[in-house]
Swiss-Prot record:
Function text: Endonuclease that specifically degrades the RNA of RNA-DNA hybrids.
GO molecular function terms listed in the Swiss-Prot or TrEMBL record: manganese ion binding; RNA binding; RNA-DNA hybrid ribonuclease activity
Cofactor details (free text): Manganese or magnesium. Binds 1 divalent metal ion per monomer in the absence of substrate. May bind a second metal ion after substrate binding.
UniProt protein name: Ribonuclease HII
Similarity section: Belongs to the RNase HII family.
A cellular-component GO term for this protein: ribonuclease H2 complex
Enzyme class, spelled out: hydrolase
Record organism: Synechococcus sp. (strain CC9902)
GO BP of this protein: DNA replication, removal of RNA primer; mismatch repair
Cofactor(s) required for function per UniProt: Mn(2+); Mg(2+)
Length: 199
């Protein structure tokens, strides 16, 4: 496994990250982003970092910059049904693979945020703990995945009123749990995540 600084210059490197792994509702999203060195510097200077450390306004402002400067990008998702069928790790890997498959050109190396390799990827890859702050491509992927998933959940909140989805994006807040106990789960809730709450 090569270290970040040992990746050959000129390699087409894709950063991959996911969002929504711990949610009770909706799909898990992933994004893959390929940047060159100039784009990396521009995005770091623009304030790019881990999406969880950015305000919603700052994240939204970075999306057009990422889209403008990246060489290619892809989004993927795996449904609540898939999460229930294969587990959250397997579903997350499906979402990541789908994001990678949407890139205009296959990468030479994939950087995966965290410490778990992408088992479905047969090419060269490297896990990067804390990748959102160490790799601009991973940080950019985290922003795109977060913005795409949040936009979907906002749309779905109109379809499934009463759960407060627009406020918590599907995470297991006290408000969300109270609504689940009162209303029961929707067709897009992850049943495997609700067993302890609903019995």
């Amino acid at each position: 496994m090569t270290r970040l600084e040992e990746i050959p210059s000129g390699s087409r490197v894709a950063g991959v990250d996911e969002v929504g792994r711990g949610c009770l509702f909706g799909p898990v999203f992933a994004a893959a982003v390929v940047l060159d060195e100039v784009a990396e510097q521009r995005l770091w200077q623009a304030g790019l970092t881990d999406s969880k450390k950015l305000s919603a306004k700052r994240r939204a402002g970075l999306v057009p910059l990422i889209e403008q400067h990246c060489l290619t990008r892809g989004l993927g998702q795996a449904s609540a049904h898939e999460i229930d069928a294969v587990g959250i790790r397997g579903a997350t890997e499906r979402a990541m693979l789908r994001a990678l498959q949407k890139l205009a050109h296959p990468p030479n190396v994939v950087l995966v945020d965290g410490n778990l390799p992408l088992r479905l990827w047969s090419g060269s890859q490297q896990t990067v703990v804390g990748g959102d702050s160490r790799s601009a491509a991973i940080a950019a992927a985290s922003v795109l995945a977060k913005e795409a998933r949040d936009a979907l959940i906002r749309r779905l909140s109109d379809q499934f009123p009463g759960y407060g989805l627009e406020r918590h994006a599907g995470y297991g807040t006290a408000l969300h749990q109270k609504a689940l106990l009162a209303l029961g789960p929707t067709s897009l809730h992850r049943r495997s995540f609700l067993r302890r709450l609903l019995g």
